[in-house]
């Protein structure tokens, strides 16, 4: 176990600074243009990997900046019921980590703006360990992934993971929480690259009606300990949420509300016509959220 200030954490700052991925390039572009990023999440393989490919194309073409591909897992403790059900459907359709990596390869071969979209693999640590760290990092990098967020891996336990992923030019993204002290936020930021992901509230994922009152304070505290771009997720679902975040964060991550839209539309089947309709609905949602982010930037109270 390591404490804040140990040489381990300082040594990795230079490694992370050297990493250049589509993620860091995209955030640099957003900063230069004065735009807020939108990061949609979908569970890969829900309802099928072919459908996920169509959804990624629609999200990217609508203006998404980074896409999180969820790797389905049988025991998703950090997720609320919506994403838990999505994982169950994806596993039932036969989706594996290897299949998700193949999906990334297919995305990179598209004749679409999606071919250059920044992709984060959003996974529990167990599937990565089952594949083997070195094999996973090599396969993820070769497929065209840009970063990995292992939801249940702590900063203290991540040294080997970070070493191997950084060697394959993969960003390592970690979660900061409202309960994190300033020292803890600094520790998490120091082992992160690409961006720092702040969860807006404690508990599991899921769409909420309003943002927590203490969220601005959390953003200010995080700004005080890192120069990394900051994305906020968990409970973000409405344009109004994104508009508020436009004055505080560099990006908003939206997951459960999109996954719920996929679930509702495909519960009785997922024909090509259904997938097309879902793709159009997801694209419309992203365009609306991007516009809300632009409106929110006019209220920015903390410089990025």
Predicted regions and their residues:
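Active-site/ligand-binding-proximal alpha/beta "capping" segment
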Residues: 195-251
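Alpha/beta catalytic cores of nucleotide-metabolism and tRNA/nucleoside-modifying enzymes
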Residues: 15-18, 220-226, 237-304
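Glycine-rich phosphate-binding active-site loops on the catalytic face of alpha/beta enzymes
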Residues: 67-74, 147-149, 154, 198-206, ...
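Alpha-helix-loop-beta-strand connector modules within alpha/beta enzyme cores
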Residues: 82-120, 163-173, 177, 215-228, ...
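Active-site-adjacent beta->alpha loops and helix N-cap segments on the catalytic face
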Residues: 19-24, 75-81, 95-102, 129-133, ...
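Catalytic cores of alpha/beta
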Residues: 50-58, 181-189, 236-252
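N-terminal amphipathic alpha-helix/helix-capping segment at the start of soluble metabolic enzymes
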Residues: 9-39, 104, 297
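Hydrophobic faces of well-ordered beta-strands that scaffold small-molecule active sites
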Residues: 38-42, 67-69, 119-123, 148-150, ...
């Amino acid at each position: 176990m390591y404490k804040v200030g140990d040489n381990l954490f300082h040594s990795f700052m230079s490694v992370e600074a050297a990493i250049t991925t589509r993620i860091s390039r995209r955030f640099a572009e957003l900063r230069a243009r004065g735009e807020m990023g939108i990061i949609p999440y979908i569970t890969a393989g829900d309802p099928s990997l072919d459908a996920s490919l169509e959804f990624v194309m629609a999200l990217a073409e609508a203006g998404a900046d980074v896409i999180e591909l969820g790797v389905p897992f049988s025991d998703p403790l950090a997720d609320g019921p919506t994403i838990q059900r999505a994982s169950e459907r994806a596993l039932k359709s036969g989706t594996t980590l290897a299949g998700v990596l193949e999906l990334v390869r297919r995305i990179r071969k598209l004749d679409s703006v999606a071919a250059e979209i920044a992709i984060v693999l959003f996974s529990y640590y167990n599937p990565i360990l089952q594949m083997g760290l070195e094999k996973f990092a090599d396969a993820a990098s070769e497929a065209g992934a840009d970063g990995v967020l292992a939801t249940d891996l702590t900063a203290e336990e991540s040294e080997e993971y970070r070493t191997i992923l950084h060697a394959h030019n993969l960003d390592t993204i970690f979660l900061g929480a409202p309960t994190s002290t300033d020292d803890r936020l600094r520790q998490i930021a120091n082992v992160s690259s690409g961006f720092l992901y702040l969860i807006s509230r404690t508990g599991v994922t899921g769409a909420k009606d309003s943002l927590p009152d203490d969220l601005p304070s959390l953003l200010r505290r995080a700004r005080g300990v890192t120069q990394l771009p900051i994305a906020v997720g968990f409970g973000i679902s409405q344009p109004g949420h994104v508009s508020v975040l436009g004055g505080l964060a560099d990006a908003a991550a939206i997951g459960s509300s999109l996954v719920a839209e996929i679930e509702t539309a495909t519960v009785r089947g997922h024909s090509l016509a259904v997938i097309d309709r879902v793709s159009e609905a997801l694209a419309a949602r992203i365009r609306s959220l991007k516009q809300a982010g632009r409106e929110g930037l006019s209220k920015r109270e903390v410089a990025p």
